[in-house]
Curated annotation (Swiss-Prot):
EC number(s) from the headed UniProt entry: 2.3.1.-
GO biological process entries: mycotoxin catabolic process
Keyword GTP-binding: no
Role: Trichothecene 3-O-acetyltransferase involved in self-protection against trichothecenes, mycotoxins acting as eukaryotic protein synthesis inhibitors. Its existence is surprising in a non-trichothecene producer organism which needs no self-protection again endogenic trichothecenes. The persistence of this non-essential gene may be due to a selective advantage that it may confer, like a resistance to exogenic trichothecenes.
Name of the featured protein: Trichothecene 3-O-acetyltransferase
Family listed: Belongs to the trichothecene 3-O-acetyltransferase family.
Database matches in Gene3D superfamilies: Chloramphenicol acetyltransferase-like domain (3.30.559.10)
């Protein structure tokens, strides 16, 4: 097994802000530039007179956050790009972290808190164009949101609706993953409570991100562990695939697995787990159940022998010896493969065990793979040649990112509103086969956002095995 040697950093009496304006090496991927992770915390506001207090508290909190972590108030820019060279992304300073305040109480197109709560906070009622300061994806020519003109590292939008507040926080993905964003949100929560930051928080929060992943020396050569990350210059696509891809109509929707459903899925999975499997997580089991169910739905339009890939995002902080609160981008992917027919026939326990096995360092060393990927990126002038991951075939595969362990239901930002009633990702453009597990509340349920073809949704919603465990929210 590959081991990473971690060199401890000495504490300094004062933190020098923006001494290093570099990103994690993984953040140098052009595909992550102006790609934003959005998360909404939704609170009930009984009294509109609290609006001024809410805005003032957020304003002071963001000012304190920017003063102590100046890079959060910056913008990401690209420099030195030309033909065959994607250049370098770095952070340039700005004067403050953006806060947008929007009053939608008189907007008839905006939902009310009562309507949101009655519908169980569906994704179709939470569109990014209304509720987010930056769109998820911002291609050249985009005219919507702040990222149309700049590339803020971090931004907040407070949306007042009738009876509630939709507080949307976004982080640029080439700077931070969802775990890093959670760390920043917790720091903002602390600053809103006017509590001082500890020396450790200041140290970790201002760490030199460009040195977070150790690189191999010049004797190292790329090997087969990077088969999923090296982008093919061309790919033969059949006429059938092109036709289906062009004609696809995909829709985002939330489904809920209640605490009882999760318990029953675990009982079912544990009956058939492979021998030698010491542990499978709830995430493993739900991922397996979704992959199995979606594959079964796709048998109505694809051949049984069609290969399906599962790409799963994995936080690698622990594997690289970095703090759990490290606020940067440290995520890699694991991959599993099977035919649609085999996935449908395979038992839940066997499939969950198979997915779990890819987290075993004896089977797949994520620490080595991450360092190898970072080394390859550092050597490559044109970083479009390397990607985490090379795109999965969305006709048959799925990509899963779990935010289930992101603890946001206890964050109140000192707004006087108590805990959020719901935490959701707003709706953005349809990206077929992309799946997000939402943060879990104290009630124990798991809400999952899936983007699937309408035909696949029809098959799923008519599948008794699926509906026995998953409740459609929309």
């Amino acid at each position: 097994m590959f081991r990473v040697k971690i060199i401890s950093q000495k504490r300094t009496k004062s933190v020098q802000m923006l001494e290093n304006d570099q990103l994690d090496i993984l953040g140098q991927q052009p595909s992550l530039y102006k790609l934003y992770t959005q998360i909404c915390s939704i609170y009930r506001v009984p009294d509109p007179s609290a609006h001024d207090h809410i805005v003032n508290t957020l304003t002071r909190g963001l000012e304190t956050l920017a003063k102590n972590f100046q890079w959060l108030a910056g913008n990401v820019v690209n420099e030195g790009a030309d033909e065959g060279n994607t250049g370098t992304y770095r952070i340039v300073p700005s004067d403050k972290i953006p806060l947008i305040v929007q009053d939608l109480r008189e907007d008839l197109s905006a939902p009310t808190m009562d309507s949101l709560e009655k519908a169980d906070f569906p994704i179709y009622m939470l569109d990014e164009k209304t509720f987010a300061p930056c769109m998820t994806i911002n291609p050249p020519g985009n005219t919507i949101g702040m990222a149309a003109k700049s590339g803020p590292v971090f931004a907040v939008q407070a949306n007042f609706i009738s009876g509630g507040l939709v507080l949307t926080i976004v982080g640029q993905h080439n700077i931070m993953d969802i775990t890093g964003q959670e760390s920043i949100i917790n720091l903002l929560n602390k600053s809103c409570h006017q509590k001082p930051f500890s020396d450790e928080e200041l140290l970790i929060g201002n760490i030199d991100k460009s040195k977070s992943i150790p690189l191999f020396d010049e004797t190292w050569e790329p090997d087969t562990t990077l088969v999923h990350e090296i982008v093919e210059t061309s790919r033969n696509t059949s006429g059938e695939e092109k036709e289906q891809s062009c004609s696809s109509n995909s829709t985002w929707a939330y489904v809920e697995f209640s605490a009882i459903s999760l318990q029953n899925l675990r009982i079912l999975a544990m009956q058939t787990c492979t021998s030698g499997t010491k542990f499978v997580s709830t995430d493993d089991i739900v991922t397996a159940f979704i992959w199995k169910s979606v594959s079964r739905a796709r048998l109505s339009r694809l051949k049984p022998e069609t290969k399906s890939n599962l790409g799963r995002a994995v936080d690698v902080r622990k594997r690289l010896g970095l703090p759990e609160t490290y606020p940067g981008l440290l995520v890699n992917m694991t991959f599993n493969t099977g035919s649609l027919k085999s996935l449908d026939h395979k038992s839940l326990g066997v499939l969950a065990s198979q997915i779990r096995r890819k987290l075993d360092p004896k089977v797949f060393d994520l620490a080595y793979n991450t360092c190898a990927l970072a080394t390859l990126l550092s050597r490559c002038p044109d970083k479009t040649k390397v990607s985490i991951p090379q795109p999965i075939d969305t006709l048959s595969g799925i990509m899963v990112s779990s935010w289930a362990k992101v603890s946001l239901y206890d964050v109140d930002f000192n707004l006087g509103l108590g805990k959020p009633k719901s935490v959701r990702r707003p709706r953005f453009i349809s990206l077929e086969s992309l799946i997000y597990f939402m943060p879990r509340s104290s009630r124990g349920e798991m809400v999952v956002a899936l983007c699937l073809r309408d035909k696949d949704w029809e098959c799923l919603n008519a599948d008794k095995e699926w509906t026995n465990y998953a409740t459609h929210i929309g």
